[in-house]
């Protein structure tokens, strides 16, 4: 940073204009910007593997579709100390809609349970397309209360963008 500032300080244009230099750190150094909570809709076995289908998509969690598993926690209606291995997948028809792979999940996981994925953020809000699903709501937890920052998108929102 010092070498950049020294160079800028010696440049006549920078002296006259005095622009602000903003350095955007990106995902790699961002802490837990958001946590994403999604509902489990289906637990199914295919060719000896367990798949948990959620109401979200990989775009809501990691729109760059990287293969790293983010930190996660399950909230099951039944407590169970036994675990099983599963893949957490999204609700689209795309083969690449894989959110987490080969993860330990409660053996009692079922429809209606929830998963929280941490470390989500930075680019997820701007890179999440409205492909098959609407934009998710954004909820802030403050002093134990849920505050809606952005409501869930609906069909009226999408149609209102068109002059039809």
Region locations from a protein language model:
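Charged (often Lys/Glu-rich) extended helix/loop segments that serve as interaction or gating elements
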Residues: 3, 9-164
């Amino acid at each position: 940073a010092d070498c950049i500032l020294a160079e800028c300080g010696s440049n006549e244009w920078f002296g006259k204009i005095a622009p602000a230099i903003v350095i955007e750190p990106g995902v790699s150094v961002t802490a837990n910007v958001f946590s994403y909570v999604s509902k489990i809709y289906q637990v199914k076995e295919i060719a000896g593997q367990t798949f948990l289908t959620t109401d979200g998509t990989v775009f809501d969690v990691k729109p760059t579709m990287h293969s790293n598993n983010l930190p996660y926690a399950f909230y099951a209606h039944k407590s169970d100390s036994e675990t099983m291995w599963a893949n957490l997948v999204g609700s689209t028809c795309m083969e690449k809609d894989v959110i987490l792979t080969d993860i330990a999940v409660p053996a009692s996981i079922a429809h209606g349970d929830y998963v929280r994925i941490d470390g989500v953020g930075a680019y997820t809000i701007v890179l999440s397309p409205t492909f098959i699903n609407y934009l998710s709501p954004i909820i802030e937890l403050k002093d134990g209360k849920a505050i809606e920052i952005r409501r869930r998108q609906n069909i009226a929102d999408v149609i209102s963008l068109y002059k039809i």
